[in-house]
């Protein structure tokens, strides 16, 4: 099998972009990343962990190392401090696009053809906003997807204007993990757009199987951790609800007891002023003495 690493155009514009504060940050950091021979993939600002600004970037060959992330963080942080686009404290997070990466440029839809994708349109197509299926590639400025969620009798192939896409993201599968690792290995070897290496069916990169297993294990662990966190949150919510119910029950019981004590006190007061009322407490009034 022949493998090449396609060089990316560092100046290719993103067709899927941000809005609001994230758009302003994107405009600020794009030239900073370009000076580092990196290009912006996406900016996302969330309230997570007290405020997070996540910036995804990549090299012209599609890779992104830890050293790249550190260099980008050192370069971007002081610029954001000066421009101050975010109100309040926040945490800056620089990362690679990841295996299940967002697709933001026209060439992204060609480079990852053959893999499963989820698309959410900013502008509906045939009354639909969400699509899922196998990415076929592009025609002109349209992303072509063979839908796996198409109802029976409906045409599965759909052409989506890339400029009207709100978000497009690869779906994490075993095939995608294998391909992403293969490309990462090729990038490590410094293979350019026109360079190839032979990868026979019986020959694999040293450590590829272990790396692939580690990636799959990491993906499974991430899913397990998400489920564990959800279960923990559900248990915590149930515990809080039970505690609240118990507290409410105790308050009602206390109020009822207080009322009973008050009634008894009233009977006692009545008994002092009228001995005959002792019958109210289960006693009998004394007979009058005769002389």
UniProtKB/Swiss-Prot annotation:
GO terms for cellular component: cytosol. Residues 188-291 are annotated as: Disordered. InterPro entries: Ribosome_maturation_RimP, RimP_C, RimP_C_sf, RimP_N, RimP_N_sf. Keywords: Cytoplasm, Ribosome biogenesis. The keyword Cytoplasm applies. One of its GO terms (biological process) is translation. It comes from the Bacteria. It holds the Pfam family DUF150_C. It is found in: Cytoplasm. Residues 212-237, 245-254 have a biased composition (Basic and acidic residues). The keyword Transferase does not apply. Residues 193-211 have a biased composition (Acidic residues). Belongs to the RimP family. Required for maturation of 30S ribosomal subunits. This is Ribosome maturation factor RimP.
């Amino acid at each position: 099998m022949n493998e090449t690493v396609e060089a990316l155009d560092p100046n290719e514009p993103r067709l899927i972009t941000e809005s609001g504060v994230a758009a302003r940050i994107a405009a600020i950091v794009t030239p900073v990343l370009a000076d580092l021979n990196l290009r912006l993939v996406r900016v996302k600002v969330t309230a997570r962990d007290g405020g997070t600004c996540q910036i995804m970037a990549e090299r012209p060959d599609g890779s992104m190392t830890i050293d790249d992330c550190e260099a980008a963080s050192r370069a971007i942080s002081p610029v954001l401090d000066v421009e101050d686009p975010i109100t309040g404290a926040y945490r800056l997070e620089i990362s690679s696009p990841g295996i299940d990466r967002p697709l933001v440029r026209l060439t992204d839809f060609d480079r990852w053809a053959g893999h499963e994708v989820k698309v959410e349109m900013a502008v509906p197509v045939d009354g639909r906003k969400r699509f899922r299926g196998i990415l076929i590639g592009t025609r002109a400025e349209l992303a072509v997807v063979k839908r796996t969620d198409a109802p029976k009798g409906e045409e599965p192939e759909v052409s989506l204007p890339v400029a009207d896409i709100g978000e497009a993201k690869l779906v994490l599968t075993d095939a995608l993990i294998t391909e992403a690792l293969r490309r990462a290995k090729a990038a490590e070897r410094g293979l350019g757009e026109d360079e190839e290496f032979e990868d026979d069916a019986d020959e694999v990169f040293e450590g590829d199987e272990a790396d692939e297993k580690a990636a799959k294990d990491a993906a499974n662990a991430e899913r397990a951790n998400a489920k564990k966190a959800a279960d923990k949150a559900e248990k915590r919510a149930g515990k809080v609800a039970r505690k609240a119910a118990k507290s409410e029950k105790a308050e009602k019981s206390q109020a009822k007891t207080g009322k009973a004590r008050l009634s008894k006190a009233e009977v006692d007061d009545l008994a002092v002023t009228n001995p005959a009322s002792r019958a109210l407490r289960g006693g009998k009034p004394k007979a009058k003495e005769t002389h």
